[in-house]
Amino acid sequence: MKLKKMLALTMAAVLAAGLTACGSSADTSAAPAAESTAAAADAAGAPDGDGDPTTLTVAMECAYAPYNWTQSDDSNGAVEVRGSSDYAYGYDVMMAKKIGEALGQKVQIVKLDWDSLIPAVMSGDVDCVIAGQSITAERAAQVDFSDPYYYASIITLTKKDSQYASAASVADLAGATATSQLGTIWYDNCLPQIPDANILPAQETAPSMLVALNSGACDIVVTDRPTGQAALVAYPDFTLLDFGGGDNDFQVSDEDINIGISMKKGNTALKNAINEVLATMTADDYNTMMDEAISVQPLSE
């Protein structure tokens, strides 16, 4: 979580602030587990969007660091973007590769706008979406979700010299000029909780949201912890405000912070196969992966 509002993981969060993953730790029976997962993939009929049963087609924005981004080469294990000379990497790509390996499939990345992700998986053009999606009831009515592959708490970003830099609660943000990304929990659910906030139009992408803050167009932006932690690398003048998840924080449900992999309704075999992979991972695994993603993300993201 972008825990954005509207299936393949392999990284995790630098700050999982008290949030724990529900996957069980891996045991020593790796080969049997891999065989079981591969069998589930076979049973799924490998319903790839391109009709190739050897390929797992995964959609993402490729513009949402540290979850996913675009780069010009295959450094760090990046995967080529379908129909492009560019490559994609990040936490989501790492997870996609981990799942693809377990299923015995090559990963193909499809770059799409945020609002096109759910329609693409519903139509069968792609097998799954791994893009920092929150597992919301609204989305679950349209697609099936895996178990969470990350848990992302909500934070606020502002500049170090801002009047809001010492804020210790949502109430302390009163009167702030604020924005966030279009179609996200952050914009739709969190910003309205700020007393007397001057809420600007939503930004199309996470990078444009950060640019708005950096340029002085707004006082604060609300986002998730991985996005905020990554932003501190690219924008050293920013500071991250974490209100601790209690009464002083933004009031959100578990679904708002559980990040899952979406797939077409009824694709139970693929869902089960992905969940088998996730069940071998722990919260520490997720956090280690996210730390790695943040450490290698392009500063422009």
Predicted segment positions?
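A ligand-binding cleft/hinge motif common to bilobed small-molecule-binding domains
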Residues: 116, 132-142, 189-192, 215, ...
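Acidic, polar ligand-binding/catalytic clefts
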Residues: 101, 106-172, 252
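Periplasmic-binding protein-like
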Residues: 151-158, 234-278, 296-301
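Bacterial lipoprotein signal-peptidase II cleavage site
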Residues: 5, 18-34
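Bilobed "Venus flytrap"/periplasmic-binding protein-like clamshell domains
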Residues: 65, 85-101, 133, 155-210, ...
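Ligand-binding clefts/hinges and TM-proximal coupling segments of bilobed small-molecule sensing domains
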Residues: 185-202, 242, 272-301
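Beta->alpha turn/N-cap motifs
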Residues: 60-64, 110-115, 124-136, 152, ...
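Extracytoplasmic small-molecule ligand-binding "clamshell" domains
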Residues: 45, 51-133
